């Protein structure tokens, strides 16, 4: 059953919450025809990260943008939440929607979750687009090494309870005054309204716990992700979209998915949050790639 939007929305979008894997996920749908696409946000984001990408894709596709467990208007995450749990959440969401294999698009910290999903449930995935994404075991741990230029917040986010302790009442300041400005190359790409929408749900008690589960996964799951990669589990076509991180995403995916075709594109002039900074170019890259994959599947 559709629900009223609890925060911001876009014209024509349908909001829903669905019971999967012992939790409830909030997702937003747009578009009535074409092959289905599942969009998975990063940090410090929610489904809203794709609010300008969705209308472009919905011209040809049925588009679904999900709030991961512990994020947005989905249920909170518990102590057991990690990338494996998140991947199963998404697998059960795809199954429940009943629209066949989906084109998976994920970015940033959701990379480990998306990689697990594509590797362990290949029948559920038609293609895999990675936007500004790293993986544990393939160099992402370096971002936590503050002695060599890593990000201070990485360890903070990976430690349950510490984000609530330090950021309570400062959610908008952290998101809007630090996180986005520090990694965006396009001024004002993330406006005050966007910041308010992201901060709205991080401000709930336990609102950072979803992020904690995914950041902790990066620090402890490297061997498991490398083992998946070495099994050549990724067989669907892959598109690596780089922006502020340059060719890092391309290099990661070519090493992690050696058994399949990995294409790449660079979004010049955009920073890390490419879907917010250059939504039309990101949407066009996804649309063109998905269109080619669909055509090959039909042929």
At which residue positions do the language-model features occur?
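Surface-exposed alpha-helical interface segments used for non-catalytic interactions
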Residues: 48-51, 55, 88, 115, ...
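Residue-level detector of alpha-helical segments with a strong bias toward transmembrane helices
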Residues: 32, 41, 52, 80, ...
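Conserved phosphate-coordination/catalytic loops
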Residues: 21, 44, 84, 280
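Catalytic histidine-centered segment of alpha/beta-hydrolase-like enzymes
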Residues: 270-279, 283
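A short, glycine- and basic residue-enriched loop/turn
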Residues: 46-47, 112, 271
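Conserved HGGG/HGGXW glycine-rich cap/lid loop of the alpha/beta-hydrolase fold
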Residues: 28-73
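Flexible "cap/lid" subdomain of the alpha/beta-hydrolase fold that forms the substrate-access gate
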Residues: 2-17, 23-27, 36, 64, ...
């Amino acid at each position: 059953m559709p629900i009223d939007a609890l925060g911001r929305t876009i014209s024509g979008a349908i909001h829903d919450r669905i019971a999967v894997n012992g939790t409830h996920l909030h997702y937003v749908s747009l578009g009535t025809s074409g092959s289905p696409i599942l969009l998975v946000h990063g940090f410090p984001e929610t489904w809203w990260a794709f609010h300008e990408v969705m209308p472009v894709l919905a011209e040809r596709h049925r588009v679904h943008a999900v709030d991961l467990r512990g994020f947005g208007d989905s249920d909170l995450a518990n102590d057991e939440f990690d990338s494996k749990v998140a991947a199963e959440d998404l697998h059960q969401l795809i199954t429940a929607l009943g629209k066949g294999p989906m084109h998976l698009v994920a970015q940033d910290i959701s990379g480990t979750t998306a990689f697990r999903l594509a590797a362990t449930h290949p029948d559920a995935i038609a293609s895999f687009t990675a936007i500004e994404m790293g993986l544990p075991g393939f160099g992402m741990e370096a971002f936590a090494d503050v002695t060599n230029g890593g990000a201070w917040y990485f360890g903070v986010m990976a430690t349950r309870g510490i984000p609530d302790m330090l950021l309570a009442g400062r959610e908008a300041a952290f998101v809007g005054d630090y996180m986005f400005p520090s990694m965006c190359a396009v001024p004002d790409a993330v406006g005050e309204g966007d910041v308010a929408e992201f901060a709205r749900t991080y401000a709930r008690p336990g609102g950072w716990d979803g992020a904690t589960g995914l950041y902790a996964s990066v620090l402890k799951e490297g061997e498991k992700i490398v083992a998946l990669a070495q099994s050549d589990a990724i067989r669907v076509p892959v598109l690596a979209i780089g922006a502020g991180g340059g060719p890092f995403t391309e290099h990661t995916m070519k090493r992690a998915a050696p058994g399949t075709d990995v294409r790449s594109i660079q979004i010049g002039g955009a920073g890390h949050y490419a879907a917010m900074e250059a939504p039309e170019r990101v949407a066009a890259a996804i649309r063109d790639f998905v269109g080619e994959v669909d055509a090959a599947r039909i042929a």
